[in-house]
Amino acid sequence: MIAIIVQTLLISVSVAMDAFAVSIGKGLTVSRVRPGDAVRSALWFGGSQALFLILGHYAASAFSAYVTAFDHWIIFGLLAFIGGNMVHEAYEEDAENAKETAQFDWKHMLPLAVACSIDAFAVGVSLAFMATSVPFAILCISVVTGLFSAAGLYIGRAFGAHWQKPAQIAGGVVLILIGVKVLLEHLGVIAF
């Protein structure tokens, strides 16, 4: 039980890294962060993560009867791909992120929230095949993402772009490691 909670928390932090990195970028562009901006950011990113997790979970649940024999490979493949992509993107980002507009209306936040939640869809697919409480995972991931995005605004304002790349790399590596853990458990190499 504790291993499942820890795994869910690690996934939550990892999936939140895109929103955290984008929020740091937004924080770089403001002279001060208002509490309302932080709340809006948290709601946009956390809510979008929850929606995409639910969509991914239901999409996978519809096909779970057909893929249970190789679900561990799906989990591993998705998490390794998402994690690898996060690490790759951290090295590919340019000054464009730092110049992101600091507006917090729906026209600016919706595309960012959706872009940061694409990975959540794949994680939602993975949740359908993992031994975890899906409602708890969705709640945990969306709350952690909301908190990280709000904190990212303040961190971006205070410290600049220094933390953006390491956060994204760390999130990617953790997702890859969780994928490896799930694969090794299903293959009987390790037991948790």
Swiss-Prot record:
This is Putative manganese efflux pump MntP. Belongs to the MntP (TC 9.B.29) family. It is found in: Cell membrane. It is a multi-pass membrane protein. The chain crosses the membrane at residues 2-22, 41-61, 62-82, 109-129, 136-156, 172-192. GO terms for cellular component: plasma membrane. Keywords: Cell membrane, Ion transport, Manganese, Membrane, Transmembrane, Transmembrane helix, Transport. Probably functions as a manganese efflux pump. The keyword Transport applies. The keyword Manganese applies. The gene is mntP. InterPro entries: Mntp/YtaF, Put_MntP. GO terms for molecular function: manganese ion transmembrane transporter activity.
